[in-house]
């Protein structure tokens, strides 16, 4: 530490060098001006309710002269000690810290005045250094310089958007530097901040930093999914490492640096279950508001603690719903926990006062869940064939259904390994229910569709069924009718051959029936199909294809794209909170014996199965138009805005999604065109090229040799890539996440587990089905304890945070200094508002039956909510957040 730094900390005036005549002449030539600034911060103690002492120590430091200092950095004059860097201005300090910062449990921002002595000849500052000499960290939101000369006789403001935690200075090996909101391509960066730009990226890469990362470390690096298992607990807790091998490929996650387990050096050790302080770079962690909202998530996750108490819910049988009335009681407060002892114990370990109120111990305790949308109109509409089919187009997993292009359906599994896996559905099963069409006519008229989970599940089915799960690989055939709705024609349930997988599958085909035992069998067949779809939704459509695949982009962007890079500014809002939510998911959701394994049918094989699906993941096919073409639900149409025409006109996800996709692409095109004049500017952008190389070779390293990756040699490559990233992080995630509680909060509609096979005639189970179909149904699907745990989790996962930032919104109006991108962003917002109106209009149009269905749930999962600034949050069933934030 140099002597001036020590002097600053101790508030001692350093010994000055005797002025020479030349120095005095230089001083006369300079014109010093006062620059008034405003710094917005949030103190740590406002977030950490038990850390009042930190606030007191900060005040003591302030009184002793250990203050928060800022130095502006010139973009015009070089530093005499390092000509590659801009000259530092005089230190300025935050004013009135002691009187402005209050010890409070409310997370309030505080604005401090700061006055800089600035030499006019140094020009406008391009960056600043901040040093925190206090005891504890604080959140630095922004610095704004007011009244800075604009060179034309007027004055302007210079904005520095920071949004970063500043730890005490001794925690860092280099200065904390922040740049103004002006965007620069690498080649256009002012010479005197180029080195700072490059050094900041090196800091974020960590330079192969070893050991476990600490909360103040700002390191972004890659790791395999090797922290899902707990091999030190025994063989039942071992899980394979995902990523780094051809057999089990996977996107990379953020590195934590935790040590290996004792039993397996390839596996990373885990934190205690209730310890949520998993390392992610501090600025990637939830905001104070989001964390407060999300603590409820942790509360629900420890429902496992209450399992012995919850078992007393039933009056007849343990862990079973005796009737649908029992299930309905979950939503009216009739489920009682008579023993408050466990509740009281749980309450005592929650250190946050506001959340103790969630588990009050004031007498009798009741579990009560909000009524899911699926039940609000009718308690039985969910059981109709129309609703069953409609949810494939407008439910919580509308991204799997495809057009049947050959009959019978064919399998793509290796016949040498799995035998004959082709479908056993034949024309005689379905033609009598096809409204006068035969199969060939229906194929030619694009009327046959399929929900096909057969190939995804069959390789794992023997192992899955060796657990408590008893399920099938399913295919569901549907007919597109004249009114635009889909009608189920048949459901095929398949099992591996008893003699082994190589002997093929053994299948049974079930067709619609309404009455008698045949009707009950059909309801069970739909339940098995729903179990498949629920598991695929949670593991693949939701976790893998949004959460997991986007994390490598976040890591690569922070390692290779400077905060002043225009593409960093474009993408950064779409990465908010994702690393934090993914880390928490690894900790309590997708880990061995975690919530997912407890509540979804693949159980311990769930994540391994998602790795198998990742083998076929193609980045370019995540573009919505290409996805629709791949699934055959659209055809190419050069006359349409997106180049495709839907074959199902009333396909709410696709109709709304294409409008959102088009709006995003227009916005990205206008933005990128402003900074990139031609293809060469993309080719010569060193940061973009490094970013793209690292993303392919490290972030998605198991797919580094795939030929489908864009070459990133044209502006169109960049535009399409950024559009796909934003689409995945915002709209695609919203479509598959926020409908969870509205549709699956009533688990019989979206069961996640099946516990026994289809009853065979002549068995006790078949007799039970004949006698009481509802009891047989409930004994087949997710049992009571898993239901309580499952809906507790999806209730939280379906909630918008009260600090949600929706597509078309930014957390600061000054996110860039460039006027044209700001205007383009306003146009983007206006377009999203038009889409909101279009969605409302379509939902009210009675011609579009799939937009509401028998359950009367308007399709709003892709309603942008750009116009909503209320910050109310909760389960709304609408709104596209900028990022995968829950």
Curated annotation (Swiss-Prot):
It catalyses: (9Z,12Z)-octadecadienoate + O2 = (9S)-hydroperoxy-(10E,12Z)-octadecadienoate; (9Z,12Z,15Z)-octadecatrienoate + O2 = (9S)-hydroperoxy-(10E,12Z,15Z)-octadecatrienoate. The keyword Lipid biosynthesis applies. Residues 234-266 are annotated as: Disordered. Keywords: Dioxygenase, Fatty acid biosynthesis, Fatty acid metabolism, Iron, Lipid biosynthesis, Lipid metabolism, Metal-binding, Oxidoreductase, Oxylipin biosynthesis, Plant defense, Stress response. One of its GO terms (biological process) is defense response. Fe cation binds at residues 542, 547, 733, 737, 886. Pathway: Lipid metabolism; oxylipin biosynthesis. 9S-lipoxygenase that can use linoleic acid or linolenic acid as substrates. Plant lipoxygenases may be involved in a number of diverse aspects of plant physiology including growth and development, pest resistance, and senescence or responses to wounding. Catalyzes the hydroperoxidation of lipids containing a cis,cis-1,4-pentadiene structure. Function as regulators of root development by controlling the emergence of lateral roots. Belongs to the lipoxygenase family. This is Linoleate 9S-lipoxygenase 5.
